[in-house]
Amino acid sequence: MVRARLYATAIGTYQVFLGGREVGSEYHMKPGYGDGARSISSQTFPVEQFLKDGRFTIAFLIGTGWHDKDGADKMAETANQTGIKMLLRIEYADGTRQDITSGEQDWVAVPDGPVEKSGIYYGEDYHQGKYISLKNMLQTGSMEDRTILSGDSLIPVSYTHLRAHETDS
């Protein structure tokens, strides 16, 4: 592997993890403010250091954020909804590349995650014990209490509305 980039966005807010370690932890409330029906920011993260051993789990924690029902007057079309779109692009020394996307593979959903409720005006109800359990699952790749989601069962995030986040160059 010579280069690996994770391109990610969400309707709502998200944290993303590779192999149990958070990617982009210096940014909070990713992807930032945006009306998911008209405009949504995406972020780009270099992730080579997360993929050293060749085996990894990708995980998202998603909350409603700006799209919570209490603050959704300007975002009525996406109120109280969440969704992700991501592309992990790995480039190899021989010139080949591997793309892993949110729309093609099956995803595992853990319906009882650590964020019990969230919103831009509400704040967040967070259960630390559930986070520790989730982090252990992510590090070991063992997803016992899970639901399989196909990529197309996630709320669609349109490519036509994507724009680079103001911190991306």
Question: Where do the language-model regions lie?
Answer:
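Flexible inter-domain linker/hinge segments
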Residues: 137-163
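Single conserved hydrophobic/aromatic residue that forms the stacking wall/gate
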Residues: 161, 168-169
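A very general structural signal that marks isolated residues within well-ordered alpha-helical segments
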Residues: 12, 166-168
